[in-house]
Every structure is written in structure tokens, then in C-alpha cells.
Amino acid sequence: MTFYDHTAIEPKWQAFWADNHTFKTGTDASKPKFYALDMFPYPSGAGLHVGHPEGYTATDILSRFKRAQGHNVLHPMGWDAFGLPAEQYAMDTGNDPAEFTAENIANFKRQINALGFSYDWDREVNTTDPNYYKWTQWIFTKLYEKGLAYEAEVPVNWVEELGTAIANEEVLPDGTSERGGYPVVRKPMRQWMLKITAYAERLLEDLEEVDWPESIKDMQRNWIGKSTGANVTFKVKDTDKDFTVFTTRPDTLFGATYAVLAPEHALVDAITTADQAEAVADYKRQASLKSDLARTDLAKEKTGVWTGSYAINPVNGNEMPVWIADYVLASYGTGAIMAVPAHDERDWEFAKQFNLDIIPVLEGGNVEEAAFTEDGLHINSGFLDGLDKASAIAKMVEWLEAEGVGNEKVTYRLRDWLFSRQRYWGEPIPIIHWEDGTSTAVPESELPLVLPVTKDIRPSGTGESPLANVTDWLEVTREDGVKGRRETNTMPQWAGSSWYYLRYIDPHNTEKLADEELLKQWLPVDIYVGGAEHAVLHLLYARFWHKVLYDLGVVPTKEPFQKLFNQGMILGTSYRDSRGALVATDKVEKRDGSFFHLETGEELEQAPAKMSKSLKNVVNPDDVVEQYGADTLRVYEMFMGPLDASIAWSEEGLEGSRKFLDRVYRLVTTKEIVAENSGALDKVYNETVKAVTEQVDQMKFNTAIAQLMVFVNAANKEDKLFSDYAKGFVQLIAPFAPHLGEELWQALTASGESISYVPWPSYDESKLVENDVEIVVQIKGKVKAKLVVAKDLSREELQEVALANEKVQAEIAGKDIIKVIAVPNKLVNIVIK
């Protein structure tokens, strides 16, 4: 039996593509453009895992498809190479992070090339290259000039073990750091901030302009957190002090019975009475040790301390005790709230705990038992009595403004972006602080401000970065003799990744970030593929920088990424015991189709879980490529199920994909190829061209592969294969299995040219008219899908089409298929356990 030799074929075509610059980006201005972007990887020491190629294969299929359709295609790759892991590794091992990073990049590049991706390597970028970060620094200077980068003394999330402050987004719900799982404490420090809040409304509005998953848009909307309400000013009794609260429910002001300030609020010390001073100071100290997430956890016990002072409720003159409590954050809103315990669960719990008044102002519920949080007509509310919510809000805002004690207000949950890191391995911030108290940006002519090479990269522990120790770099003197110090903080890893897609467009430009005409030609990115874990941070930061650059006239579009697609996660094979605990794969043996714990003998349940070193279920793509070939890995990952689904890795599935490619190879190399068309394959061939074209365009790669299988089955039943159909079929499969595609194209044409730019096959509508039939797919006897398929499909073909269907895939995910009963032209019944 004939098999294709991937160990010979794949390196041969990889060398051909490299030698011939096959995937150099097209520049023919008469052609349409297609910009396919992958989220570039952080080059870790571990190398690629099989999750990386899933998204990369998807963009590669699209890129190859669009080239064949006559587009100029920009399909680049680069490295997000600054950041904590390399620095941490360097400190642990004594290695230079630059050397470690360069080795990792070389390994990643080797692995990526072995998978046959059609990247234009002339456009490779590396965020740690001074020629790249010159422009990261240039963008920072523009932010600084526009007042969007500023210094502030802010309470930060300090991680002693990392020697740096981290952003709110990098703190886990349990109050530890995302990287390393270390304790996080709050401490005030001088930090660089970026004023992303100035763009809050545009970041919200322009989500309507892009084709993104609604779930991702919702995550960004929630993060931006727009609220419409009112600011209300409360005077502190017997003082000249006052404070402002923002509330979305000014209509409930008659029910406000106490106020709560954040422990860090500027007013706290001024209004705390002598007999409460010690308790307040003690409480402030405890609050400083908690992260924002820990403080605002709804499930935690309510704590607080009375300041000894009272505020005056402006609408009824009632006295309201002023408390401090850690669930109110100084960084959120005004750092103060009016508490309406009758209609807010957290306020109600607090009021019950500390025996504070609870006055209902909305009809309904029993506020002695629980807070009433639904809507009702107003009661106990003077001039608002009997009004509904909308009318009462409008009337109260009118009253507040007339009395001069409040006004209508729109607020956002979004906070400014904490931009500085007290670490070595990042872009230096191009600012000089002079001894006369002024600060200036490093002029463009002196950029890049290069990160100095130093042996001592341990955190200083003082809150400054290790750059504070490099005195010959640190200290500068102006022409007028004034001395200065360079900024020692560095930028976060998010900086370089906020604009890299722009540099790919013109990566070697030494005069500007990128040429305007090229930016006009290529923007926006047509498809951006990456993990949903970047839904908020990276995507929000990149959109923010893009909008700033749009305002500066640098980029021609309001949004960077027109379409976003999140691939699912590839889960590892893993096992659970009766307690639900995961068991490492090296502790498991298979007997008679079941799985047992090697040490205890307990029978285990197979349960897919995220691949991890501890479970010993990480699959290295190098091993798969060596055993099965890159084309098999690509086809398998695209055929596993819908691209956005999370699916378990399966060795059997891999073997199935390899067998399919062997059948393809045999079909084209051993079948008699003839110049005359018998017509026997007219319908299935034209159906296949139509289906694959439409499904690739919609990124439904699994159903496209299922249709290719249908064609192979049909063609194998014929003695001869019409040469045009053989060529067309090879073109259809080439984006999925490019090495095999090239090899078979040469077998059919001997052209010596790559298949990459051969025009995509078209189909003949008139050949599709033969009757289709609707079949039903049943699982456990219940109809789960109805499919329209070609009449007279064999049992095997019917089974393949049914099992590739998205609805069916969802139903059978993670379950054992006992048998499949296919009745041609009628139904498919799937029996699962």
C-alpha cells in the first residue's frame, strides 16, 4: 500500500518556500488586500505546545485561500519578547535575559517553520529590538505630549517577590499575582499612568463598528462600565467639610441612612474624632494589606469603623453616620458612597451588622428580612412619592441641580492604565527628571533610548528598577549644566503588543513608525485570531493606542481589527479519581478499554483538562510532526470540531487524519488520471468546490474537511479520475495540507512552480442540480440535527458528514460512541455512552 513520506516531502517544500520567498507579501496595487494576523507569542523556554498551531493553522488556511483568490496577503509573525518570565528565569539561573530570549525565539521559529505556515519572514518583528522599541518609545512621547501619560502617587498592587507593582488586571480573585501566585499588598508609589479613561466613550461606541464575538464585546463593555446617574454633595456636620458621592439611583436619596468612605479617602483623617482615631488608624492599616479584588468580594464578611462624624442628607436634613469600610475603593467613583440599606444587599448586610437604620423608599418586599432590590413606586420620599423609577430619577436630578447640591453625571468603571514596572527587562521610559523639578521627554532624534546591558538585574527592593544601579546610563547633564536622572521604571509587556500589527506593515522604516500610504493600503486587520483570555487587556490597550494614533493622523482607521476570532482550547487527556482529583497520565494504565490508577488500582474516569506539566499531558508538536507529519497535525486540529470549541486531544483522531492524507496521496498518485470527463464525479466535485470555498471563508474548517473526505470516497469508487477534477481537488486540500498539496500538484503538472498562486477553482452551478435529500441525525433516538446531503451517499459518507456537523459535535463531545447506524437517504442514528 502506498503511503506518503512526510519526512522527505515536508522539509523539501519548506526549503523550496524559503529559497523562493514564496510568501513574500504581494504589492500589486490593483489587487484586493487581505491582512491575516495571529496574536504573536511570548517566546517561552518551553517552546510551542499543540495549542499554538490551532489558531496559526486557521489564519494560514485563510491566507493560502486568499492568495489563490488573487489577493495581496499580509501574513506576518513576530515575538512579544519583553516581560517578567525571561527576567525571572535570568535571575534564577544567572543568564542574560537577552540571550535566553534569542535562544527561545530561534526554537519557536524552528517549530513554526516545521508546521508549514506561510509567513512572510521579511516582516518579522521583535519587541526587544531597539529598532522596534524606538517606535514604542516614540508613541509614549506622543502620549506624554498630549497629557495622556502622567505621573501620579497611587496605591499600587505591590508584589514583594516580583519586586514590582502590577496592574489590577494582573491580580487574581484570591488576591495573589497572576504570575507566580505571590501575595499582593497595596502601597502608595510614584507611577506612570496612561489616561485611557479619556477614550472611554469612544472605546465603548466603536465596538459597534467591528465584527467581534458578542461575548468579547460584552466583556469590554463591562470593563469600561458606563453608568449614568448623579453626583450628590454631603456636608459633614459641624465642619466646613463636604464630600461627593456618585449614585446611579439618586431617586433613593430619602433612604440614605449612612455614608461610607474608602479608608484612603482624603477626608478620613480630617473628620475622624479623637475617640475613634485609634480604631480608624488600625482599620486603615489592615485595609492596605488587601487587594482591590479581595476587598470587593461580595462573599466576604462586612467590616468597617465609624469615624465619629455625621453627614447631613441634603434632601431631608437627617444626620447620617460616616463610616469607613474596605469594600469602598478610593480608585473607584469618588471613593465615597451613600448607603441605602433597604434596597442594596451589601448596604443591608452592613446595616444589620452594625445596627444602622434601614428606611424603605420603594414599595414592595420586607426590608426587615432582606433588601428589596426590584423596582417599585416610591414611598417615604416626599416629593417623589408615587413616582416610578425613571420619573423619580429625573425629578431628583432636577431638584439636586436647582438646590446646588448635585448634578447629572456619567461615570466609567474603567481606571487609568498603570503603565510602569520596577523591572529591568522592558522598554526604558524615555523621560528625564531634572534637578530643577522639571521633566522632559527624550527627543525623537535620541530614540531609541537603549536598555543598558547590566549583570545586576535583581529588583532594587526600594521601588526603583535595577536601572537605578546603572549610574553611567542613569545620570545626564543638560547643555546648561543642569543635572538629571533618567526614568528608571520600564514599560509593561503590554506596550510592545499594543501596536505590533502596525509595524508589520512597514517593518524596516527608519524614519517613521510606518509609511502613511502603506497603512492606508493594509488597515484595518481583516482577521485577528487568538485566545479569548486577551479579551479585555491586550485588545482594549491596542484599541486605545490605535485611537490616539488616529487622532495624531498616523493611522487612517478608527479601529485596528475588523474581525476577531477566538479559537477554543485544546485540552489534554487526563483522568479523575472518585473524589474528582486529577491523576497524572504516568500514574494510569489501560486495561480492557478502562483506566486504572497504577498505585491504588482504582478505576478512573477519563476527563479532558487543560494541558499542564504536572498532569504530564502536554503534547509537543515536534513529536507529532516527527511521527505523523505537519500536514496531519494541521488537518487533525482543524477537523477536531468547530474552531471556537474546546476539545480534547486524541491520538486516535490524529491517526485518522493521517490515514485520510494517505488516501488522498494514493488517490492522486495511483489512480489513472485522464483528460476526458466521464461526468460521474460532476456533482460531487462541484459540490465540494462550492462547500469548501464557502466554509473556508466562514472558518468552518471541520465541515470543509468532511466535504473533502466525501469527494475522496466518491473518486475512489471510479476507475479513472478526470485531470481537471484531480487538480481542482489538490488545490482545495492544499491550504490544509500544504506540503502534500505542493507534492501532488507537481505529480499532476510538473510545473516546477508553487501551487500557492494558482487561481482557486470555480464550480459550475448547473452541475449541482441533481436531487439533494434531507436526512435526520438522531442521538439516543432523539433528533438532534437535520442535514441536506447529496442523494445516495454511502453509509460511510453519511456517517462522516453527520459526525462533522457542529450540533452533533456538541452533543457527542467527551462521550464514547458505541455505534453509528446510517441509513442512506434517510437517517443517521448515533449510540453514545
Swiss-Prot record:
InterPro entries: aa-tRNA-synth_I_CS, aa-tRNA-synth_Ia, Leu-tRNA-ligase, Leu_tRNA-synth_edit, M/V/L/I-tRNA-synth_anticd-bd, Methionyl/Leucyl_tRNA_Synth, Rossmann-like_a/b/a_fold, tRNAsynth_Ia_anticodon-bd. Its EC number is 6.1.1.4. Keywords: Aminoacyl-tRNA synthetase, ATP-binding, Cytoplasm, Ligase, Nucleotide-binding, Protein biosynthesis. ATP binds at K613. It is found in: Cytoplasm. It catalyses: tRNA(Leu) + L-leucine + ATP = L-leucyl-tRNA(Leu) + AMP + diphosphate. A motif ('KMSKS' region) lies at residues 610-614. Disulfide bonds: none annotated. GO terms for cellular component: cytosol. A motif ('HIGH' region) lies at residues 41-52. GO terms for biological process: leucyl-tRNA aminoacylation. It is an enzyme of class 6 (ligase). Its main location: cytoplasm. HAMAP family: Leu_tRNA_synth_B. PANTHER family: LEUCINE--TRNA LIGASE, MITOCHONDRIAL (PTHR43740:SF2), LEUCYL-TRNA SYNTHETASE (PTHR43740). Belongs to the class-I aminoacyl-tRNA synthetase family. This is Leucine--tRNA ligase. The gene is leuS.
